Amino acid sequence: MANSERTFIAIKPDGVQRGLVGEIIKRFEQKGFRLVGLKFLQASEDLLKEHYTDLKDRPFFTGLVKYMHSGPVVAMVWEGLNVVKTGRVMLGETNPADSKPGTIRGDFCIQVGRNIIHGSDSVKSAEKEISLWFQPEELVEYKSCAQNWIYE
């Protein structure tokens, strides 16, 4: 399949606490993407600081790390045609107030500081984030029986 790629998606502590894990996974599955990695964990502050290293000079960095460390997260790797770009569209804007209805943030969020989900913003950042959160042996290679019904 041409342009098949992987993206990193993380359901943040507020999404876990609000019971939205199943709904979010359902949306990605129904779209036709394939789940190839999944972890439920309490992320360490060191992991979070590395993950958000590009934001380290921003005034909200310390609060972001504290928030992400405040509860469990669901870390996932999804695979499919243009999954990075399409995944970002499915998430909605970082600020939920700017997100359209039908997007995850548009349907379930109100405030930017509690926007329930993270998604890689480029193929390059997806590769970095996946390697940070997952070991290669934790990612599963398989062909979905639905693949021929999703892709030409």
From Swiss-Prot:
Its EC number is 2.7.4.6. It is an enzyme of class 2 (transferase). InterPro entries: NDK-like_dom (IPR034907), NDK-like_dom_sf (IPR036850), Nucleoside_diP_kinase (IPR001564), Nucleoside_diP_kinase_AS (IPR023005). The keyword S-adenosyl-L-methionine does not apply. Keywords: Acetylation, ATP-binding, Cytoplasm, Differentiation, Endocytosis, Isopeptide bond, Kinase, Magnesium, Metal-binding, Neurogenesis, Nucleotide metabolism, Nucleotide-binding, Nucleus, Phosphoprotein, Transferase, Ubl conjugation. It catalyses: a 2'-deoxyribonucleoside 5'-diphosphate + ATP = a 2'-deoxyribonucleoside 5'-triphosphate + ADP; a ribonucleoside 5'-diphosphate + ATP = a ribonucleoside 5'-triphosphate + ADP. Disulfide bonds: none annotated. SUPFAM superfamilies: Nucleoside diphosphate kinase, NDK (SSF54919). There is a cross-link at residue 100 (Glycyl lysine isopeptide (Lys-Gly) (interchain with G-Cter in ubiquitin)). The active site is at residue 118. It is linked to This protein is found in reduced amount in tumor cells of high metastatic potential. This is Nucleoside diphosphate kinase A. It comes from Mus musculus. The gene is Nme1.
